[in-house]
Structure formats: structure tokens, C-alpha cells
């Protein structure tokens, strides 16, 4: 299927605007015929001694009329064709962004940020140029060439016209071969640009780590290698691009030589006039643009085709986590029950035989060593992944029976790697609901024990925190992320190791606030520091994806297992730190 067929949905969507633009292009092509025709008549009148002042003024009027008409119509087709093409860019970017929001974490492990950015910028820009400059070139070149050739054929000399177009088949063959090479080269240059984008994004994000290890020289060398590869790929593409215009001009020059040779002989024989020859050469000059446009069109079409293939491949990726065909309505918080027989991530068994339940309003603590499966339990509840064997039930229904947006609307999630936007503290906290009053924001920050930190800043809640909260400490980032979740007062609050960068005293105050404000709400806390879950109604100890201990804090201490030993060890460490202070 050709790229034009693939974009036909857009041309149908904007058919009225494109139709107006094409009509304007046709009229410009017709008006373009007037100046050479007028010139030929004036030259013949001068050589025949028949030119009067009235005829001269009338011909000048025709020229001015044609010039003003073309000026206005060129403005129209630019607005209606080139202007409309930007609409395609807008639609495709929206499609891509919507697609990104629906994809599972596995998708983002396959595609890197820089690669996705390249699709949303360079590839879509190539499509925009095709829908604008490409359509304009195709229509304008076709109409101009057709109208001009017909005029040359029937109003001047069909013999000269046939001679003039003799080089065209050879040009078409050469252009086709060059187009195929351009297609391949542009695909490689776009892939190289994606890699460069990835490298820049990764290098800038990790600049602190690079400096701390004194790795600047090696990182610069690595970047220069990627940069050089991108340069070479772009240079190869430009090499083929640069061949188009000289090649077209070579064939156009051949047409001029043949026309002058045959035309001069015909003038000598009296078959045509000097004015006819001048008009014919002027028309031939007008054919230069259509011939050049063929090269431009081949170039821009190949680029658009490559970019559309890349975008199409991206949009064809489907998330393994989907909404049910017949979703349940009216989701409500209630009894949460895990009944997981097994779950594998990337073909590796992650969770096995996970069975427990949590009543509405209770708190669940998940503890265990790193990699024990705590976060996997959270991801399954959020439906970032789906259970292989078994199910998770909420209020008696499999969570897969609810729409994703409905399920997640019940939850406030604070992940291990919290993400903050490069805006103000106020905007970050109100991210879930920008219309919340300042009083609600202040209350949420007090619950998360970050209020005083904020008011001590010169700009207070209007402080711009930089990309990913770069101006804040680790503990401040965690507490801001908690404020963002807590301000929504979710039915299910999930804190995934969200207190790791907070000191023990602040942690105790936050936990105390949670106990007070979330008596009728479900709370799930994963932690390495066991003091964060001592108040939980149910604590699960995970090891290698299995539950090895369960119960309340007192129950687990009585078991004298992993939990009790770890808790006692951590308490001794905390006491030692306090004594040292």
C-alpha cells in the first residue's frame, strides 16, 4: 500500500480545504501561461512593426492582472494545503501520546525515551512535510506540466514539444533508482537520530553520576561516537538528496539544447515565428519547476514513507493489559482478596501461591528482602501486569472485570521511584485535581510532614523544583509525592517503599497521621524499615515470591522468624544512631 493510500483517511478528513488549495493551484498554473503568451505576441508585433501604444498598454494590463491573481491564489493554496498539513502533525502526535498512556511498563522497557521522542518529532515532521509540500508538489507539478505541455503541443508546435520531452523517460528511470537509495538511507538516518536522542537524554539525566565518577571524558567519547555515526548517516542521505537537482537540471539542459536546435531550424524554414520560439522556450522554462518537483516529491515521499512505517510499527504495539469487553460499572472499594497461584515476569517465576484478604479500612504491610516480590504485588493490583494463574478480587469481583481507568481512580500510588514535574510545588501536588484549593494542599503537606519545609523556601508553594525535583532532597521528594496522592483521599492508598529517605521521627509522625485520617480507607505499605508497618492489621513477609510469614506485628514477633530478627536488628541500629547523636 502506498503512503498516499495510508494517509487517505486524513485527506478525506480535510478534503474541503485540500480541494480549495488544489483549485487555487490549478488557477495559478493557468495564469502562468499568460506572461509567455503576451511576450510572444509583443515580440511578433515589434518585429512586424504593428505594435501600437494601446496594444502595449493592454498587454501590460494582462500581465499585471495575472501577477495579482497569482499573488492572491498562491497565498490561498499555501494556507489551505501547507497550513492544513500541520493538522496531520497534531493528530498523529495526539494518537502517539494517547497510545503511550495505554501501554504497559513492558513497552517502556522495549522503547527508550529518546526513541519515542524521535517518533513524536522527526518522524511526524516528515509526515507533515509530505501532507503539505508533497501534496503541493504533486498537484502543482502535474497541473503545470499538463497545462503547459498541452499549450505547447496545440498552440505552437507538436514537433518541438515531442523533441523537448525526449529526455523525460530517462529522467524518470534515474529518479526512481535514486529514490530507492534515498528510502534506505533516510531509514538509517532516522534510526541513528533516535539513538542520538537516547544518548543525549541518558547523558543529561545522569550527568551527576557521570561527574561523581569522573567519567566525563569517557562519556564524551561515547557521545561523540554516536554523534559521528548520526552525522555519517545524515551525510549519506544528503548525498542522495543532492543528486536530485543536478540530475534534473542535466535532463532539462538536454531539452533546451534540442529545442534550440530544432526551433532555430523551424524559424529559418518559416514554420514558426521568433515570438513562437520565445514563447515555447518560456514554457519550457516553466517545465523546470515540475521536473525539479519530481525530484523533491520522490525525496519527500521516501522520507514520509519511512517515517510512517516507524510510527505505524509503534502504534501497532498492543498492551497485554486491556479493558474487558463487557466491563462492570459502579466500582466501589471493599474487601481486597489476592488469590494468585502463579505470576511470571519475562518468563521468570515471580510470585507463587499468594493468598490473603484485606477488609476495607485495614492496613496491609508488605516486607521482605529486595526482589522478594513486594512491588510485583502492587503492580498486579494496579493492573500494570495481569496474573497468569489466579485472580485479584475487589469487593467480590475480579479486578480485570473493571475498566482500567475506573480501577485506578480508587487508588493513590506513591512508587519507589517517585516522579516530580518541572513546575511549582503547588502544581505538582495538585496534579490529580488542579482545581483543589490551597487549603487542601496545605493540609496534605502537613499530613506528609513536608509543610514546614515548603514554607521555609523563599517562594513557598510557588517554588519551581526543576526537572524531576532536582532542587529537593530525597526525603522532600518522597513526601511531596505522598502529598500528591494523599490530597485525593483515595479509597486505596499504596506507599511502595515511600518512606525510605525519611528519618525515623518523621516516619513515625507520617504513620501516626495515616492511622488517624484513613480509618475507613484501605492502605498498603511496602517497606524495608519495619517500623513503617508495625501498626498494620496484616503484615506479609515475602521471600522469593512466596509468603513465609503472616500476621500482626505482635504475631510475627512471637514467631521469632525473619520479621522478628530483622525488627530487633533495626531497632538496635536506630538505638545506636540515637546514642551516637
Please tell me what each predicted stretch does.
Residues 1-15, 116:
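A short amphipathic helical element positioned immediately N-terminal to and/or at the very start
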Residues 15, 105-106, 122-131, 135, ...:
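An intracellular "coupling" helix at the cytosolic face of ABC transporter transmembrane type-1 domains
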Residues 18-73, 154-159, 271-274:
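Transmembrane helix-loop-helix hairpins at lipid-water interfaces of multipass membrane proteins
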Residues 23, 34, 121-166, 251-255, ...:
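Hydrophobic alpha-helical transmembrane segments of ABC transporter permease domains
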Residues 86, 94-118, 122-124, 198-222, ...:
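Short intracellular "coupling" helices and adjacent cytoplasmic loop segments at the cytosolic face
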Residues 163-178, 279-288:
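Small-residue-enriched core segments of transmembrane alpha-helices in multipass membrane transport
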Residues 215, 239, 286-314:
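Cytosolic ends of transmembrane helices, especially the final helix of ABC transmembrane type-1 domains
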Residues 331-581:
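ABC-type nucleotide-binding domain
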Amino acid at each position: 500500500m502506498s503512503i498516499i493510500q495510508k494517509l487517505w483517511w486524513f485527506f478525506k478528513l480535510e478534503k474541503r480545504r485540500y480541494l480549495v488549495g488544489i483549485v487555487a493551484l490549478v488557477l495559478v498554473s493557468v495564469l502562468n501561461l499568460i506572461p509567455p503568451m503576451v511576450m510572444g505576441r509583443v515580440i511578433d508585433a515589434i518585429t512586424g512593426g504593428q505594435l501600437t501604444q494601446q496594444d502595449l498598454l493592454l498587454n501590460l494590463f494582462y500581465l499585471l492582472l495575472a501577477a495579482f491573481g497569482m499573488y492572491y491564489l498562491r497565498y490561498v493554496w499555501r494556507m489551505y494545503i501547507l497550513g492544513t498539513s500541520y493538522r496531520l502533525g497534531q493528530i498523529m502526535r495526539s494518537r502517539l501520546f494517547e497510545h503511550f498512556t495505554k501501554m504497559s511498563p513492558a513497552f517502556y522497557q522495549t522503547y527508550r525515551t529518546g526513541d519515542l521522542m524521535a517518533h513524536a518529532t522527526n518522524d511526524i515532521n516528515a509526515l507533515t512535510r509530505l501532507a503539505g509540500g508533497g501534496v503541493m508538489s504533486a498537484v502543482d507539478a502535474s497541473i503545470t506540466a499538463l497545462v503547459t505541455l498541452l499549450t505547447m503541443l496545440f498552440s505552437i508546435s507538436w514537433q518541438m514539444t515531442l523533441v523537448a520531452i525526449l529526455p523525460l523517460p530517462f529522467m524518470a528511470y534515474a529518479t526512481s533508482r535514486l529514490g530507492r537509495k534515498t528510502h534506505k538511507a533516510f531509514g538509517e538516518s532516522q534510526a541513528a537520530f533516535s539513538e542520538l536522542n537516547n544518548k543525549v537524554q541518558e547523558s543529561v539525566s545522569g550527568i551527576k553520576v557521570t561527574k561523581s565518577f569522573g567519567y566525563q571524558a569517557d562519556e564524551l567519547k561515547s557521545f561523540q561516537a554516536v554523534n559521528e555515526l548520526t552525522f555519517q548517516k545524515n551525510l549519506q542521505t544528503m548525498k542522495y538528496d543532492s543528486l536530485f537537482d543536478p540530475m534534473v537540471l542535466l535532463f532539462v539542459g538536454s531539452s533546451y539544447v534540442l529545442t534550440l536546435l530544432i526551433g532555430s531550424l523551424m524559424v529559418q524554414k518559416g514554420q514558426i515565428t521568433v515570438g513562437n520560439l520565445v514563447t515555447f522556450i518560456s514554457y519550457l522554462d516553466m517545465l523546470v519547476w515540475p521536473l525539479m518537483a519530481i525530484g523533491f516529491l520522490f525525496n519527500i515521499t521516501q522520507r514520509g514513507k519511512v517515517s510512517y512505517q516507524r510510527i505505524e510499527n509503534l502504534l501497532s504495539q498492543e498492551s497485554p493489559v486491556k479493558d474487558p469487553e463487557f466491563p462492570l460499572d459502579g466500582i466501589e472499594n471493599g474487601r481486597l482478596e489476592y488469590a494468585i497461584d502463579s505470576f511470571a515476569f519475562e518468563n521468570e517465576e515471580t510470585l507463587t501461591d499468594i493468598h490473603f484478604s484485606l477488609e476495607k479500612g485495614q492496613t496491609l504491610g508488605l516486607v521482605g528482602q529486595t526482589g522478594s516480590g513486594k512491588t510485583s504485588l502492587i503492580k498486579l493490583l494496579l493492573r500494570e501486569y495481569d496474573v497468569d494463574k489466579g485472580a485479584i478480587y475487589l469487593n467480590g469481583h475480579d479486578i480485570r472485570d473493571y475498566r482500567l481507568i475506573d480501577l485506578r481512580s480508587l487508588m493513590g500510588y506513591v512508587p519507589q521511584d517517585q516522579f516530580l514535574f518541572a513546575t511549582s510545588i503547588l502544581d505538582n501536588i495538585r496534579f490529580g485535581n488542579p482545581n483543589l484549593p490551597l487549603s487542601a494542599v496545605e493540609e496534605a503537606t502537613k499530613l506528609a510532614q513536608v509543610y514546614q519545609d515548603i514554607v521555609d523556601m523563599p517562594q513557598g508553594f510557588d517554588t519551581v523544583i526543576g526537572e524531576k525535583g532536582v532542587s529537593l532532597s530525597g526525603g522532600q521528594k518522597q513526601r511531596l509525592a505522598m502529598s500528591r496522592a494523599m490530597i485525593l483521599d483515595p479509597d486505596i492508598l499504596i506507599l511502595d517503599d515511600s518512606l525510605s529517605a525519611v528519618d525515623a521521627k518523621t516516619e513515625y509522625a507520617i504513620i501516626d497521621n495515616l492511622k488517624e485520617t484513613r480509618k475507613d480507607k484501605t492502605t498498603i505499605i511496602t517497606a524495608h524499615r519495619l517500623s513503617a508497618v508495625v501498626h498494620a492489621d496484616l503484615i506479609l513477609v515475602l521471600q522469593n515470591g512466596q509468603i513465609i510469614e503472616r500476621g500482626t506485628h505482635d504475631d510475627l514477633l512471637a514467631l521469632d522468624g525473619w520479621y522478628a530478627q530483622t525488627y530487633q536488628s533495626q531497632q538496635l541500629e536506630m538505638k545506636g544512631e540515637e546514642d551516637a547523636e
